[in-house]
A protein has these predicted regions:
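A short acidic (Asp/Glu
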Residues: 34-38, 125-126, 159-168
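A structural signal for short, well-ordered beta-strand segments and their strand-loop junctions
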Residues: 113, 148-153
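N-terminal low-complexity, intrinsically disordered segments
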Residues: 29-103
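Aromatic/basic-lined ligand-recognition segments
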Residues: 152-191
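N-terminal alpha-helical "arm" segments
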Residues: 1-43
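Well-ordered, non-membrane alpha-helical segments in soluble/globular domains
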Residues: 90-95, 126-138
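Secondary-structure boundary elements
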Residues: 139-149
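Glycine-rich, often proline-containing surface loops adjacent to acidic residues and nearby aromatics
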Residues: 19-21, 104-124, 191
Length: 191
């Protein structure tokens, strides 16, 4: 323990945790995700296959897959249960005021998370590039079963609509994903 971290601990502050840099797709039902599915998605999303001579690879051990590509290392978790455990459902619903967001939280039965493993705590420009790659990969898995996309770092949940894939494939996905195609419908509206 460093002197600074010891002083912070003695003052009663917990050390700052690195934010979870992740893209989470919520699905209506569990989905199979084979090694070939991940391989094809990487090729479509990033324009080329992994190159062994560059020490790039994809390793799948369902429900987990690892992708090392260029300078990033990702973990994909394909889970056949809700992202939010039942005991936290009510609390999660309070975090999202919009009815379509609540629907995603309530109705999804499975999720696919794409988590950045390396680089750790990247500076802003590197993080933006990592998000671009992660979002482009996520777009390859968006289908009619996908209810929405969640970003744990920003706590933003975007319900799936006709523009989600375009937002994920854009050069500024974190900005574009917050631009919804339709007016928001709030649960707080009174009739």
């Amino acid at each position: 323990m460093t002197l600074v971290s010891k002083a912070i601990s003695l003052l009663g502050f917990s050390p700052a945790k690195a934010p979870l840099i992740s893209v989470v797709l919520h699905f209506r039902r569990p989905r199979a995700l084979s090694d070939q599915d991940v391989q094809a998605a990487v090729t479509r999303a990033w324009g080329r296959d992994v190159r062994k001579e560059l020490n790039e690879h994809i390793v799948s051990r369902p429900p987990i897959s690892f992708v090392k590509f260029d300078r990033i290392f990702l973990m994909l978790s394909n889970v056949s249960k809700p992202y939010c455990p039942a005991k936290y459902l009510e609390q999660a619903l309070k975090e999202f005021p919009e009815l379509r967001q609540k629907k995603v939280v309530k109705e999804h039965k499975a999720f696919l998370s794409i988590d950045l493993q390396n680089p750790k705590a990247p500076r802003r420009s590197v993080k933006d590039d990592c998000y671009r790659r992660m979002c482009r990969l996520a777009a390859e898995f968006v289908d009619e079963s996908c209810l929405g996309v969640y970003f744990p770092e920003t706590a933003h949940l975007r319900p799936n609509d006709r523009e989600v894939k375009n937002a994920l494939r854009s050069d500024r996905p974190l900005k574009e994903i917050t631009n919804w195609g339709e007016a928001h419908i709030s649960a707080n509206l009174r009739t």
